Amino acid sequence: MNTCTPNIKSSYTYEDLLASGRGELFGKEGPQLPAPTMLMMDRINLMTENGGLFDKGYIEAELDIHPDLPFFSCHFIGDPVMPGCLGLDAMWQLVGFFLGWIGGKGKGRALGVGEVKFTGQILPNAKKVTYRIHMKRVINRKLVMGMADGEVEVDGRVIYTATDLKVGLFQDTSAF
């Protein structure tokens, strides 16, 4: 069984997030964030073990938007827009990060999402994306799994919402 002990830090810099991608933040047994260019945040402003809509934990993170971000040059030529799936992946990344933050061990894998709604887009002239994750449940048994609702906001406007984001931590992913 995993024993989850919360990390005492409540915010993380870009350098901290890169350390997570190298397996240095939560140790070699803990979950890792992806490295750039798949890392979809520049900082985590707030992590709480309680709080959020369900009082099970809350995460707020940001991504600074620049016209030279790699996806703008290919999605789509002449009509650049950040792929919506990257915003969804960012929310999964944050749920997995939360599981590592509370002391969970294993390799993080997205397990699903209940519903996703897109009501806007992220264009190269945007300034900042804010992600908000409201943890709903954490299971800490042989498998550590987190479930959350989340939203993506661009320049103060909510443009994506997701319910029942699920991420699990696995000791062995060979049979996954």
UniProtKB/Swiss-Prot annotation:
The keyword Isomerase applies. Belongs to the thioester dehydratase family. FabA subfamily. GO terms for biological process: unsaturated fatty acid biosynthetic process. HAMAP family: FabA (MF_00405). It comes from Actinobacillus pleuropneumoniae serotype 5b (strain L20). The active site is at H75. Necessary for the introduction of cis unsaturation into fatty acids. Catalyzes the dehydration of (3R)-3-hydroxydecanoyl-ACP to E-(2)-decenoyl-ACP and then its isomerization to Z-(3)-decenoyl-ACP. Can catalyze the dehydratase reaction for beta-hydroxyacyl-ACPs with saturated chain lengths up to 16:0, being most active on intermediate chain length. GO terms for cellular component: cytoplasm. GO terms for molecular function: (3R)-hydroxyacyl-[acyl-carrier-protein] dehydratase activity; trans-2-decenoyl-acyl-carrier-protein isomerase activity. NCBIfam families: fabA (TIGR01749), PRK05174.1 (NF003509). It comes from the Bacteria. SUPFAM superfamilies: Thioesterase/thiol ester dehydrase-isomerase. Its EC number is 4.2.1.59, 5.3.3.14. Keywords: Cytoplasm, Fatty acid biosynthesis, Fatty acid metabolism, Isomerase, Lipid biosynthesis, Lipid metabolism, Lyase. It catalyses: a (3R)-hydroxyacyl-[ACP] = a (2E)-enoyl-[ACP] + H2O; (3R)-hydroxydecanoyl-[ACP] = (2E)-decenoyl-[ACP] + H2O; (2E)-decenoyl-[ACP] = (3Z)-decenoyl-[ACP]. Gene3D superfamilies: Hotdog Thioesterase (3.10.129.10). This is 3-hydroxydecanoyl-[acyl-carrier-protein] dehydratase.
